[in-house]
Structures are given as structure tokens and as C-alpha cells.
């Protein structure tokens, strides 16, 4: 495979640690380059569940280690992430190159990948990040919107906590509404879910109560067909968790 120079000067053919994305729908969103690098690695660490790894061909499956068991329901998410980071670093100390494979794009709202990037380089390792299909890509297709006309993207909790103004004449994507104001892990769709009343009240500073928005979850082999749940902004706090789990909130322009 021909080496490709990244903006950091790290060749994609000789890294110690690869930070890779599995895309939104695994395994069909894996790029050819990602598959080639996985074949080159001595170990593949991932937060995909063990039952999903059977979708890999046998030669890659044998090198996979699922770290899903380190994510504990109800525990602070930051503690779960730290345990995963430490385990990937421990494995990379003895097996190189190692790959970290995570759903979506590896650096879009992924605390584990961000920590591995900084801590790996602090150790003097060559760390390479490869892009992948993210929910931003798939959701724009789901709602059939061309961002050339403008798009505001923010994480839902951060938007409210930082009191960020919203331009109502520009469509908005708010990521991770399913964990709004929640710092602990929610691993079951049967959970009570977040209280979206503060998010609703914040959005009402910029939109009418009747302005319609959609909770969008893109199709994937693991989660099923795409789901788009339209509601008026004034009603978003009444939705059951199953309607918002794993979704992104799309708000068209007013």
C-alpha cells in the first residue's frame, strides 16, 4: 500500500497506533484503506460489541478485542472512557501497530479517540487518524439537505451550558440529545432517558413552540432502518427514550 502523508507528517503505512472509524453502518461503511490498515495491524481494539465482530472476515476477527465490557451502565461516562483509553494504550505498548476502531468518524464527538491521539503522541508514538462516514454525512442524506445553504452544528448539552445563540434563519444539527445533561452511561433503550425540558425551553428563545424539528437516527445494519421522528419544539420533552436514543436533532430554518 502506498504511504500517504497526513497533515501531521505521519505516514498511514507506518504508524504505531491507528485511530479508525467504522462508519455509521458496520461493516459496509469501512473504507478500502481502513480495511487494508486493519489487515496490517497486530491487534484491533474496538468498542463494537462481541456479537457484531462476526461480520468481519476470519483473519480480521481473530485480531479483534472488544472493549465493550468496560462501558458500564450508570457509571460516569468519563470513567468508562478512561478505562478504555488505558486498555488501548496498554495493548499498544506491546503490540504495534494497534488499531482503535470506533463507530462513526473517529474524531467527531469521540472522547476516547481524542484522548488516544493526545496521549499516544505524548508517548512519542506515531499516531494516524483516518476519516470515516459520520452521522453528519448520513443525516444530511436522511433529511435531504444541502449544507451549501448553511448549517449550524453543536452538541446539545454544550449549546445550553455555554448559552450559545442560534441563528434561526440557518438549519441546525444538535448532536447527542439522547444524553442531554446526563454525565453517566445509558446503555439500554428501556431507560427513562434525559429530561429535555431545559433544551426545549432554551430553543424557545429562538423558535416558536409550533416550529417543527426531527430526531433523526440513520439506518445501519446493527440498529435497523432510518428513523425520523418529527415534533413541534414545544413537545420534544414528551418523547419516549426509544424515539431519541442514538439520534441527532435536526431543526430546519424558521
Stretches with model-predicted labels:
Residues 2-20, 43, 93, 126-254:
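Beta-strand/loop-alpha-helix module characteristic of Rossmann-like adenine-cofactor folds
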Amino acid at each position: 500500500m502506498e504511504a500517504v502523508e497526513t497533515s501531521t507528517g505521519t505516514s498511514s503505512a507506518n504508524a504505531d497506533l491507528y485511530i479508525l472509524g467504522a462508519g455509521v453502518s458496520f461493516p459496509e461503511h469501512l473504507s478500502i484503506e481502513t480495511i487494508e490498515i486493519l489487515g496490517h495491524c497486530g491487534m484491533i481494539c474496538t468498542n463494537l460489541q462481541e456479537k457484531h465482530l462476526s461480520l468481519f472476515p476470519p483473519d480480521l476477527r481473530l485480531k479483534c478485542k472488544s472493549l465493550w465490557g468496560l462501558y458500564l451502565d450508570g457509571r460516569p461516562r468519563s470513567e468508562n472512557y478512561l478505562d478504555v483509553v488505558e486498555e488501548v494504550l496498554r495493548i499498544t505498548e506491546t503490540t504495534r501497530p494497534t488499531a482503535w476502531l470506533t463507530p462513526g468518524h473517529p474524531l467527531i464527538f469521540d472522547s476516547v479517540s481524542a484522548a488516544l491521539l493526545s496521549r499516544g503522541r505524548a508517548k512519542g508514538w506515531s499516531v494516524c487518524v483516518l476519516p470515516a462516514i459520520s452521522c453528519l454525512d448520513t443525516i444530511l442524506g436522511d433529511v435531504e439537505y444541502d449544507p451549501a445553504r448553511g448549517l449550524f452544528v453543536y452538541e446539545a448539552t454544550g449549546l445550553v451550558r455555554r448559552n450559545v445563540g442560534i441563528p434561526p434563519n440557518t438549519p441546525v444539527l444538535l448532536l447527542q440529545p439522547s444524553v442531554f445533561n446526563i454525565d453517566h452511561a445509558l446503555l439500554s433503550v428501556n431507560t427513562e432517558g434525559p429530561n429535555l425540558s431545559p433544551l426545549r425551553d432554551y430553543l424557545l428563545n429562538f423558535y416558536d413552540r409550533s416550529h417543527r424539528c426531527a430526531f433523526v437516527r440513520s439506518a445501519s445494519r446493527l440498529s435497523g432502518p432510518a428513523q425520523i421522528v418529527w415534533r413541534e419544539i414545544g413537545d420534544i420533552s414528551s418523547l419516549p427514550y426509544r424515539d431519541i436514543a442514538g439520534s441527532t436533532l435536526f431543526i430546519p430554518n424558521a
